[in-house]
Amino acid sequence: MNAVAQAATPDVNEVPAPLVFTDSAADKVKQLIEEEGNPELKLRVFVQGGGCSGFQYGFTFDEETNEDDTTMTKNGVSLLIDSMSYQYLVGAEIDYKEDINGAQFVIKNPNASTTCGCGSSFSV
């Protein structure tokens, strides 16, 4: 018996996720929130001026969701992005890597024309 996979017809109102929040990143954030002992915490990802390439990424925990925040949930973890940062992060991937160089959150951003060697700074 042959099976043929058919692509689902996308809903015209369907909007792609603004960014990818990997399982690895969500699981690490969940672990950090559990260590803090405050289940109300959410991970806020933001872009601000600075760094050697003009913009830099930032991460912080926040209990509050602002009116202009975009919210994503993965594996029970909420990710917040403010409206200014959102425009720079659309299409990006937030991951958590552990390797010989250590452990860190990594953002792969298709909007960045150049990135710094440290990986936390970029320009558009």
Curated annotation (Swiss-Prot):
Gene3D superfamilies noted in UniProt: HesB-like domain
Record has Iron-sulfur as a keyword: yes
GO annotation terms (biological process): iron-sulfur cluster assembly
UniProt GO MF annotations: 2 iron, 2 sulfur cluster binding; 4 iron, 4 sulfur cluster binding; iron ion binding
Keywords annotated in UniProt: Iron, Iron-sulfur, Metal-binding
Residues at which iron-sulfur cluster binds: 52, 116, 118
Cofactor notes: Binds 1 iron-sulfur cluster per subunit.
Names of required cofactors: iron-sulfur cluster
InterPro entries named among the record's database cross-references: FeS_biogenesis, FeS_cluster_insertion, FeS_cluster_insertion_CS, FeS_cluster_insertion_RrpA, HesB-like_dom_sf
A Pfam entry, by short name: Fe-S_biosyn
Family to which this protein belongs: Belongs to the HesB/IscA family.
Self-association state and partner proteins as the record states: Homodimer.
Purpose: Required for insertion of 4Fe-4S clusters.
Listed name of the protein: Putative iron-sulfur cluster insertion protein ErpA
Source organism: Ralstonia pickettii (strain 12J)
Name of the gene this protein is made from: erpA
